[in-house]
Amino acid sequence: LRTLWIPDGSQARLIDEEIEYPVGTVISKTFYYPTNAEGHVLKQIDLAERQIDLSRNKIIETRLMVRRDARWDAFPYVWNKEETEAFLRIAGSSVPINLKSDTGDHDFVYFVPNENQCSGCHVTSHPAGDMHPLGAIATQLTAAFDYPKNNTELQIDKLVTRGWLTKKTNGSSPVSWRDEAANLEARALSYLNIQCGHCHNPEGPADTSSLILDGSHKFLINLGVCKTPVAAGGGSGDMLYSIVPGAPDRSILLYRMRSSELDEMMPELGRSLIHSEGISLISRWIGQLPGSCS
């Protein structure tokens, strides 16, 4: 659940298709799991449910990004068991959770990032870059949302009609990775962009890997096709290439997505479980790639 608040009398500006938020802006992201009638925490969420009733969900944490005069600051809050109050946890925290699904129970530890770990993703230009939002940007606020009074509007257009943004964007909208009707490659690259591009970009902390997944490079070698690892260590799974066309099970990229080991898994922050839907998508994309690495 994401929210955006802009101080009264202030506006965000669209400059070169990028949103510049005013001082005092607060962006929140609340993490939760759905619950059943018995109060058990469930693994699957109903993505078709656009209006969220938090009373039917187990709330875990809320992360805030606050715009200051010269920078963004991040604040992780953890909710109490009664879900009546959230407490600031600058040093991070851990929450044991039991999830129920059709395949049985899943026990795991939910890790809340500390303040410094927030910058691990939200500083996309290293080493001297500043923290900034990843989701509340012009190219990502393009989903249609059902607002009150039967009003369906793109999120970024709603910011304009509300008076929170100076003008609409002229840029193109990315394909949603969930859109089954869209091109498979476009969906896969969109998924890799939002999951990996904050690090795997020409100026990011993973730039030395030469694996560029933020959409800025279209050469197959930059996407990992037949590219040997630079510093994967044990994360390579004794495989030779990041992506082997037609062979997802021999591709390091998918191996690391499937792993939950701390020194292997990708993304390395922000998850404790394996994202089966994303793995299925990337596996299908790699499986239909033509060519070979021999």
Segments the model singles out, each with a brief description of its role:
Residues 18-37, 45:
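Extended, Lys/Arg-enriched charged tracts that mediate electrostatic binding to polyanionic substrates
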Residues 1-23:
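A domain-level signal for the mature, folded cores of soluble proteins
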Residues 6-9, 30-32, 269:
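Acidic/polar N-terminal loop/beta-strand segments that form early-domain functional surfaces
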